[in-house]
Amino acid sequence: MSGNTGERPFADIITSIRYWVIHSITIPSLFIAGWLFVSTGLAYDVFGSPRPNEYFTESRQEIPLITGRFNSLEQLDEFTRAL
């Protein structure tokens, strides 16, 4: 026998005016905040990822591929020194 948890049924929640008043403001706000976060470049600064024009420098146009198993730290230092 199943019991009642005391929660409102989902159908009651999504058909209420209060739900749509709250979510008609929050959902577009979250979308706009995310768009601004990415379009202003703040996402690149926060997560430390390179911007699209910083993947390749003028002096290094090849892919920074680490090929050595035992000298990987030296190769990594060489790649970061070129930045």
Curated annotation (Swiss-Prot):
<dbReference type="InterPro" id="IPR013082">
    <property type="entry name" value="PSII_cytb559_asu_lum"/>
</dbReference>
<keyword id="KW-0604">Photosystem II</keyword>
<dbReference type="GO" id="GO:0009055">
    <property type="term" value="F:electron transfer activity"/>
</dbReference>
<comment type="function">
    <text>This b-type cytochrome is tightly associated with the reaction center of photosystem II (PSII). PSII is a light-driven water:plastoquinone oxidoreductase that uses light energy to abstract electrons from H(2)O, generating O(2) and a proton gradient subsequently used for ATP formation. It consists of a core antenna complex that captures photons, and an electron transfer chain that converts photonic excitation into a charge separation.</text>
</comment>
<keyword id="KW-0479">Metal-binding</keyword>
<dbReference type="Pfam" id="PF00284">
    <property type="entry name" value="Cytochrom_B559a"/>
</dbReference>
<feature type="transmembrane region" description="Helical">
    <location>
        <begin position="21"/>
        <end position="35"/>
    </location>
</feature>
<keyword id="KW-0408">Iron</keyword>
<keyword id="KW-0472">Membrane</keyword>
<keyword id="KW-0249">Electron transport</keyword>
<dbReference type="GO" id="GO:0009535">
    <property type="term" value="C:chloroplast thylakoid membrane"/>
</dbReference>
<dbReference type="GO" id="GO:0009767">
    <property type="term" value="P:photosynthetic electron transport chain"/>
</dbReference>
<keyword id="KW-0793">Thylakoid</keyword>
<dbReference type="GO" id="GO:0020037">
    <property type="term" value="F:heme binding"/>
</dbReference>
<keyword id="KW-0150">Chloroplast</keyword>
<dbReference type="Pfam" id="PF00283">
    <property type="entry name" value="Cytochrom_B559"/>
</dbReference>
<protein>
    <recommendedName>
        <fullName>Cytochrome b559 subunit alpha</fullName>
    </recommendedName>
</protein>
<comment type="similarity">
    <text>Belongs to the PsbE/PsbF family.</text>
</comment>
<dbReference type="GO" id="GO:0009539">
    <property type="term" value="C:photosystem II reaction center"/>
</dbReference>
<dbReference type="InterPro" id="IPR006216">
    <property type="entry name" value="PSII_cyt_b559_CS"/>
</dbReference>
<dbReference type="InterPro" id="IPR006217">
    <property type="entry name" value="PSII_cyt_b559_asu"/>
</dbReference>
<dbReference type="InterPro" id="IPR037025">
    <property type="entry name" value="PSII_cyt_b559_asu_sf"/>
</dbReference>
<keyword id="KW-0812">Transmembrane</keyword>
<dbReference type="GO" id="GO:0005506">
    <property type="term" value="F:iron ion binding"/>
</dbReference>
<keyword id="KW-0602">Photosynthesis</keyword>
<keyword id="KW-0934">Plastid</keyword>
<keyword id="KW-1133">Transmembrane helix</keyword>
<keyword id="KW-0349">Heme</keyword>
<dbReference type="InterPro" id="IPR013081">
    <property type="entry name" value="PSII_cyt_b559_N"/>
</dbReference>
<feature type="binding site" description="axial binding residue">
    <location>
        <position position="23"/>
    </location>
    <ligand>
        <name>heme</name>
    </ligand>
</feature>
<keyword id="KW-0813">Transport</keyword>
<comment type="subunit">
    <text>Heterodimer of an alpha subunit and a beta subunit. PSII is composed of 1 copy each of membrane proteins PsbA, PsbB, PsbC, PsbD, PsbE, PsbF, PsbH, PsbI, PsbJ, PsbK, PsbL, PsbM, PsbT, PsbX, PsbY, PsbZ, Psb30/Ycf12, at least 3 peripheral proteins of the oxygen-evolving complex and a large number of cofactors. It forms dimeric complexes.</text>
</comment>
